Amino acid sequence: LLLGDYTEIEEWIADGRVDCGFLRLPTRKDFETIFLEQDNLMVVLPENHPLAECERFPVKALCGDPFMLLEKGAKAEVSEIFERYKLTPNVRFTTWDDYAIMSMVESGLGISILPQLILKRIPYHVVAKELDVPAYRNIGLALKDRKIASLATKRFLKYLHY
């Protein structure tokens, strides 16, 4: 079991280092993919933030606070939001460690955007809000070729449908 960013996982699959990997879709055209889930990207705020009670967080307000950026390598969903809406956030810290970001947000050092799946059952005292614009990632399983996959991978694929 290996942990890496999307680019690393794509390389591992292509090189045969791993049989399959969880990736953001779409991915490389030469991979077979199985869509698993759409995961909303949520704004994460300290509990005492002025917008903690809003129904949906205004995307333009992302530039109003110091921002903790979850990013490593290419294909970063959060940076794509900023590019799409022509925003320049006040990025104070960039890391790939989502728990470090939640701790900094809880301490009032800024705000962030994190995937909703990461925010389930967390010990941090933070507030998660949907953006007022669509923001999500599609998660899927990718592999080179199902027909030549290992027996273990084929059995794993059967369990995905449960």
Task: Write out the residue ranges for each language-model feature.
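Secondary-structure junction motif
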Residues: 65-85, 149-157
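Short loop/turn segments at beta->alpha junctions
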Residues: 5, 58, 96-97, 115
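Central regulatory/effector-binding core of bacterial HTH transcription factors
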Residues: 1-29, 88, 95
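Beta-alpha-beta core module
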Residues: 29-35, 39-40, 54, 99-148
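Flexible hinge/capping segments at coil-to-helix
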Residues: 30-41, 45-67, 151-153
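Short hydrophobic/charged patches on amphipathic alpha-helices used for structural packing
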Residues: 10, 14, 33, 59, ...
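Extended ligand-binding regions for polar small-molecule ligands
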Residues: 60, 138, 142-162
